[in-house]
Amino acid sequence: MTHQLRSRDIIALGFMTFALFVGAGNIIFPPMVGLQAGEHVWTAAFGFLITAVGLPVLTVVALAKVGGGVDSLSTPIGKVAGVLLATVCYLAVGPLFATPRTATVSFEVGIAPLTGDSALPLFIYSLVYFAIVILVSLYPGKLLDTVGNFLAPLKIIALVILSVAAIVWPAGSISTATEAYQNAAFSNGFVNGYLTMDTLGAMVFGIVIVNAARSRGVTEARLLTRYTVWAGLMAGVGLTLLYLALFRLGSDSASLVDQSANGAAILHAYVQHTFGGGGSFLLAALIFIACLVTAVGLTCACAEFFAQYVPLSYRTLVFILGGFSMVVSNLGLSQLIQISVPVLTAIYPPCIALVVLSFTRSWWHNSSRVIAPPMFISLLFGILDGIKASAFSDILPSWAQRLPLAEQGLAWLMPTVVMVVLAIIWDRAAGRQVTSSAH
């Protein structure tokens, strides 16, 4: 007998997916864009939504079609290359960068204003924080109950309060856009959404969503795909509504902060202005819940993935990943971002290429011909973008600085599109040769 999810479980799955996506970066970036974009806020918002909502939802759908794992999604590039890509992806959005960052961001926004940002408070906070992350992550079968039915609703309630306040009680009027947004509001919004790295997160979370449905007794592939797609679409709608409210919050906060302020400062100023003395506590609770849920999802997904390739149990890996993330988090937010941005900028393009081209697999004689070369090119030019975003940008040759869209951090895009066209021509030509030789 085919087991189907109840409506309540489907909604909980959607809540869980939304909650897994919304980390501190998702709450901080939109107000920054809104403040700096000024009168061009909705043009910038459109660009932001394409990369911060459209691409991640597309990734969830792509993963659902192959059963939830990035290793399955990457079969056209070969097993070794696929496992290597998946490993790099999981490490980057797991214990090396994204998971530790959830602790440092929640500390600096919620705790540091009270304790100062010295090493000891951060160490104590990270110890408690990752103890909770490990405890929740040890029971993946209960993830839907813990996150979908408890933590996610708390998180959503806090976000709804903030979003409604931003619309009902604007802090002031819209200021004039900065020079960058006056000249290119759409592309700046597009790049800021790209830098949230949610597509990488989606590649990791896909297997978490599928396994959460499996834990409710769903085994049929068709139903697993359907429920995962529904969860992704529900999360996409939630993200869009949240981002639009946060854009409004940022665009109306020009009277509270300088236009160069970061997202945490904008949120803190707005919440203090609107909610008074309790504002700091509300913001701290919001960021803590957002970061904690994201960290749990990342830890579960990474442990599930590495358990397939190393002779360690899932529970042992949860302890290792949680402990390692705690150690890395004590580098502090600024240093962690400085190290992570170039690496993430380099590995993001081939992941985008893989996700987009995965929907075309059935169109080609040999999907490897069409998918592998563009991924390789996107990685090469993504590395150039990564170097440009690092402290070693001076070593880049002058031609690399003059590439189309290089200023926007998207130098990989045009060469990848050209390679896709060439790969399609190659596939058609090689396919015809095979057909003619068969007669």
Curated annotation (Swiss-Prot):
List the ranges whose topology is Periplasmic. 31-45, 101-118, 171-189, 248-277, 338, 391-404
Q: Keywords for this entry?
A: Amino-acid transport, Cell inner membrane, Cell membrane, Membrane, Transmembrane, Transmembrane helix, Transport
GO terms, biological process: branched-chain amino acid transport; isoleucine transport; L-leucine transport; valine transport
- InterPro entries in the record: Brnchd-chn_aa_trnsp_Livcs
Query: Is Membrane tagged as a keyword?
Result: yes
Q: Where are the transmembrane segments?
A: 10-30, 46-66, 80-100, 119-139, 150-170, 190-210, 227-247, 278-298, 317-337, 339-359, 370-390, 405-425
One Gene Ontology CC term in the entry: plasma membrane
Q: Does the keyword Transferase apply?
A: no
Where is this chain's protein located in or outside the cell? Cell inner membrane
Q: How does it sit in the membrane?
A: Multi-pass membrane protein
Superkingdom assignment? Bacteria
- What is a single molecular function from GO for this protein? L-isoleucine transmembrane transporter activity
Per the record, what ranges lie on the membrane's Cytoplasmic side? 1-9, 67-79, 140-149, 211-226, 299-316, 360-369, 426-439
Q: Which Pfam families match?
A: Branch_AA_trans
Record's function text:
Liv-II branched chain amino acid transport system, which transports leucine, valine and isoleucine. Also acts as a low-affinity threonine transporter. This activity has probably minor relevance for normal cellular physiology, but BrnQ may form the main entry point when the threonine concentration in the external environment reaches a toxic level.
Q: Which family does it belong to?
A: Belongs to the branched chain amino acid transporter family.
What protein name does the entry list? Branched-chain amino acid permease BrnQ
